[in-house]
Swiss-Prot record:
SUBUNIT field: Homodimer.
Binding site for pyridoxal 5'-phosphate: G76, R77, W102, T156, D175, Q198, N240, T241
N6-(pyridoxal phosphate)lysine found at: K199
Native organism: Shewanella amazonensis (strain ATCC BAA-1098 / SB2B)
Gene: serC
Keywords annotated in UniProt: Amino-acid biosynthesis, Aminotransferase, Cytoplasm, Pyridoxal phosphate, Pyridoxine biosynthesis, Serine biosynthesis, Transferase
Cofactor(s) needed: pyridoxal 5'-phosphate
Protein name according to UniProt: Phosphoserine aminotransferase
Pathway given in the UniProt record: Amino-acid biosynthesis; L-serine biosynthesis; L-serine from 3-phospho-D-glycerate: step 2/3; Cofactor biosynthesis; pyridoxine 5'-phosphate biosynthesis; pyridoxine 5'-phosphate from D-erythrose 4-phosphate: step 3/5
Compartments, record wording: Cytoplasm
Amino acid sequence: MSAVYNFCAGPAMLPAAVMKKAQAELLDWNGQGVSVMEVSHRGAPFIQLAKDSEADLRELMNIPDNYHVLFMHGGGRGQFSAVVNNFLGDNGKALYLVSGQWSKAATEEAKKLAGDNSIDVINVVEKVNGLNKVVIPALSGNGSEYRYLHYCPNETVDGIEIFDDIDSPWPIVADMSSNIMSREIDVSRFALIYAGAQKNIGPSGLSIVIVRKDMLELPQLTQSSIMDYRLTAENDSMYNTPPTFAWYLAAEVFKWLKSVGGIKGMAEVNAEKARRLYACIDSLDFYKNGVAPQNRSQMNVTFQLADESLDKDFLKEAEALGLVALKGHRIVGGMRASIYNAMPLEGVDALVSFMRSFAAKHSS
């Protein structure tokens, strides 16, 4: 079978080495004689897996000791609710920066739970010379106006990424579902980081929460046990049955990432993948990207064909070559190539080669 490169935005492709290992030990994990899907989450073998995976993630991201690492249910949308419910009791307020579809969705969920008067919003994307550019105003305050500031560093739908650190007098909460572990960050700048697993961590069904311990002292809005950070931390993410198979695969992804140079090494590869793809887009009038260069996502490269009538042909011919899931999100249309950690350089090179040949064939 010829190679297939999966550019899906999520659930996304997993590293081939991880998939092969999971296949090899699917029926007999860790010498147990049964699948990891069949063992008790409270048994010693899985407890060890949980401890090892947390240790690996802490090492990869250099997570300080004053942070909890939680393995939870619910994905990113689940965390939209969890953040509000855990931090906005006693009439607390929060500030949300909107840079695209996912930060907008988080804002809408926050308003639904806490009420419009508890959520202030700043739209931070402006059209500059016809391109979407992130412009974050100076944020000033004494630190007591808001319980937290929420933003999404990478917008998968819009192809927008915020690379610069945000200077905020309030604790920063970040939805890193689509760019976690793609480049180095200083975790200590954040009060909470959350990420749905299905892009750079593992399969869907799992979410990672990295939360500074002092944040758990804030009054809760509601006490929903399943998404209670305090309860989850007190029970080592085992208050209820976790998504064990997704956790196992995440643990294997962490090991794989360590073996290929860690986040520093992966960041170099990711930057090169994005550079090659954007260089192709910019060098041909046949394609266009609507994001300012400094905010172009390294994970989700969006582009449109100059002649939209060729969209279906582009997708059909790409798929025939094993380049799949390139259709853009229904809200924005066009194309989207998601090139998360697991996408090899060879996949990007194959896409670039096809894009150049397709453009040559259809250019007048």
